[in-house]
Amino acid sequence: MGWECTTVDVNPRYEPDILADVREMHFKEGKFDVIWASPPCEHYSIAKTRGARNLPLYDSIAQACLRIIDEVKPLVWIVENPMGLLRHRPFMSGLKKWTVDYCMFGAPYRKRTDLFMSDNMSEGLSDVLCDKTCGQVDKAGRHMNVCQNGPSSRKPGAAYIGKLDSRHSVPPALCVGILIKIESIISNQGAEDGEHPGGGKVEGTPHG
């Protein structure tokens, strides 16, 4: 689609364009047209049933993502995180949110996910939650796969998706739908400004 993308991550295994901690980063206003942030989700996850949660650490990362968005003031921004405790943190209050089940976009598991986003992205969107027509449920109406690293006590007998990259991935169909809407927003903005639409700069922040 003609996008120039810059990836940011603290983990070298993902080979990001910028290897850094987002809490130590600053960008100038207008640096990126679009920002997609996926702050780490493990300690926000409702699937975490062992060990203490380090919410101060995870909050500091999520807040850094929001700070960068405020600094850059991109035309479009999205903060992605599996539905869990992040939606209840005080600093997320008031942000527009779109909630989707990944199984409705072709994923082999439900993985209900919150997408916090700029007002222009949220316009016209309704939550897309599983209605049992996703093709991933058994005869009892339960999802056959669980997106977590280990068996689910809540769903005995369900298969689990243990590979890290698989658990972190966003369904391609959902990505395409989001990109189409972003293209429309960028094109409309370009027409209003008298500029030639197309292309753009995108930033991605750490995996969640």
Task: Please place each PLM-identified region on the residue numbering.
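Adenosine-cofactor binding site in Rossmann-like domains, unifying the SAM/SAH pocket
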Residues: 1-29, 34, 92-99
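Residues lining the SAM
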Residues: 38
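Accessible peptide chain termini
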Residues: 1, 207-208
